[in-house]
């Protein structure tokens, strides 16, 4: 007899009434009384455990059930009984149990409650806990939503390289490969972005996207930063800043809406765990007609006024042109000024933005955009790309960027490169927002951060 999925049982319980079935999974919980043992089994198909009942009128089976340790792998066979008056619509009346693998008594995840910090230190086991099971299921469904959106809108997927000879962002926060010079005959890094590869392919396919891991050697110890994280990076030829803003908003709203539909069970569970207003927040994002769009200079005025009036008390209070907005500023704009709504900030000073961003006519700003979210701050950043070769070279020189490894990127401008625009959306940050997580390390299976790489 092949195993039945627990998710199928809960989806259509009436179809399984009085049927003999087999389950394979793990023992998640066990309750014993004088005459009956309740085994809670999970097979990974759903967040819910199925209750399997062992009665005392089968002494050998009862004794076996009593001896099974938590986390043991089991095969359980029996007859389905409907229980419409109970919390669950059905249960399994057990006739046979096979213990496939016995978990030792020192299994770390016992019945008691564990802190999130405990789980972060035991990342290889934490997905067995319901909280992380739910988070990682949402992660999978969010990934699916990303692919569904871009394929439905005729984007071509580009597999950008992990190893690279350049620092895309020009910030110097890269991991250098120890054997790079010896093996490749030049300095080699782990990629900080798939953008450059996407730009190349956008000049052929027009609309492309990358979705993969990126690496930053930032020695940050905040709840918002990882050294290895996943990025969604679309790139569109002939697009401008207005086109980009529309694409970002459409992407974010659509994928969140799809996850809300497909991961309702998991999100309801996480709402009870972390955030009583989780679904309300997500609905507010998806139902907002248009995200607010704010000029960088206007953002400075709002922040300066808020500080002067006593509405806010920022740690960083220098609101002169050239301020790189901090998280406290970004969150104030979203949460206080715009009443918990997303905000696009556009046209930033060129001095702290990347060399490849297209300069505006004013000579001091670039066509860049950041999407700010409540509770998080920046979740997405993008720009128009500089299409003029001479201007791009001048910008590299002004920023003292060695163009030896960028010749191919510059050369693209020689042959039909009219315009391009793209953005990078932090997948893990978006997931953390959707799940109501305060620490991004809870949003990725095996978090890597400064001083922490245990697996």
Curated annotation (Swiss-Prot):
InterPro entries reported in the protein's UniProt record: Aa-tRNA-synt_II, aa-tRNA-synth_II, aa-tRNA-synth_II/BPL/LPL, Asn-tRNA-ligase, Asp/Asn-tRNA-synth_IIb, NA-bd_OB-fold, NA-bd_OB_tRNA
Annotated GO biological process: asparaginyl-tRNA aminoacylation
UniProt GO cellular component terms: cytoplasm
Enzyme class: ligase
Keyword Signal: no
PROSITE patterns, per the entry: AA_TRNA_LIGASE_II
UniProt GO MF annotations: asparagine-tRNA ligase activity; ATP binding; nucleic acid binding
Keywords: Aminoacyl-tRNA synthetase, ATP-binding, Cytoplasm, Ligase, Nucleotide-binding, Protein biosynthesis
E.C. numbers: 6.1.1.22
Localization, UniProt: Cytoplasm
CDD domains: EcAsnRS_like_N
Pfam hit, one: tRNA_anti-codon
Recorded catalytic activity of this chain's protein: tRNA(Asn) + L-asparagine + ATP = L-asparaginyl-tRNA(Asn) + AMP + diphosphate + H(+)
Assigned protein family: Belongs to the class-II aminoacyl-tRNA synthetase family.
Self-association state and partner proteins as the record states: Homodimer.
Protein name: Asparagine--tRNA ligase
């Amino acid at each position: 007899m092949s195993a039945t999925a627990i998710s199928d049982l809960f989806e259509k319980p009436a179809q399984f009434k009085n049927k003999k079935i087999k389950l394979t999974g793990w023992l998640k919980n066990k309750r014993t009384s004088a005459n009956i043992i309740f085994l809670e089994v999970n097979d990974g198909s759903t967040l819910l455990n199925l209750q399997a009942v062992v009665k005392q009128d089968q002494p050998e089976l009862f004794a076996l059930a009593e001896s099974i340790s938590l986390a043991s792998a089991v095969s359980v066979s029996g007859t389905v009984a409907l229980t419409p008056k109970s919390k669950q619509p059905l249960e399994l009346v057990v006739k046979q149990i096979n213990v496939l693998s016995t978990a030792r008594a020192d299994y770390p995840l016992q019945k008691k409650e564990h802190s999130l910090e405990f789980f972060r230190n035991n990342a290889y086991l934490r997905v067995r806990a319901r909280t992380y099971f739910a988070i990682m299921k949402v992660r999978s469904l969010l990934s699916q939503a990303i692919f569904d959106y871009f394929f439905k809108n005729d984007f071509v997927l580009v597999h950008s390289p992990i190893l690279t000879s350049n620092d895309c962002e020009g910030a110097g926060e890269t991991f250098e490969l120890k054997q790079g010079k010896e093996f490749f005959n030049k300095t080699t890094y782990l990629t900080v972005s798939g953008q450059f590869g996407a730009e190349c392919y956008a000049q052929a396919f027009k609309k492309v996207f990358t979705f993969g891991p990126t690496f930053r050697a930032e020695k940050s110890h905040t709840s918002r930063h990882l050294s290895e994280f996943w990025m969604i990076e679309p790139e569109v030829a002939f697009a401008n800043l207005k086109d980009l803003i529309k694409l970002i908003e459409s992407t974010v709203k659509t994928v969140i809406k799809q996850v809300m539909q497909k991961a309702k069970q998991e999100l309801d569970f996480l709402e009870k765990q972390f955030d009583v207003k989780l679904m309300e927040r997500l609905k507010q994002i998806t139902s907002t007609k248009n995200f607010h769009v704010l000029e960088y200079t206007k953002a400075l005025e709002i922040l300066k006024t808020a500080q002067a009036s006593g509405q806010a008390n920022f740690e960083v209070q220098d609101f002169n042109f050239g301020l790189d907005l901090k998280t406290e500023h970004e969150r104030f704009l979203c949460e206080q000024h715009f009443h918990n709504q997303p905000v696009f900030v556009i046209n930033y000073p060129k001095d702290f933005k990347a060399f490849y961003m297209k300069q505006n006519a004013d000579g001091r700003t670039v066509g860049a955009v950041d999407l700010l979210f409540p509770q998080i701050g920046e979740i997405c950043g993008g720009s128009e790309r500089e299409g003029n070769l001479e201007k791009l070279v001048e910008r590299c020189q002004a920023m003292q960027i060695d163009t030896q490894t960028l010749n191919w990127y510059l050369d693209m401008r020689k042959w039909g490169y009219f315009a391009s625009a793209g953005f990078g959306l932090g997948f893990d940050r978006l997931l953390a927002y959707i799940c109501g997580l305060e620490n991004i390390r809870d949003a990725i299976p095996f978090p890597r951060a400064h001083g922490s790489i245990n697996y």
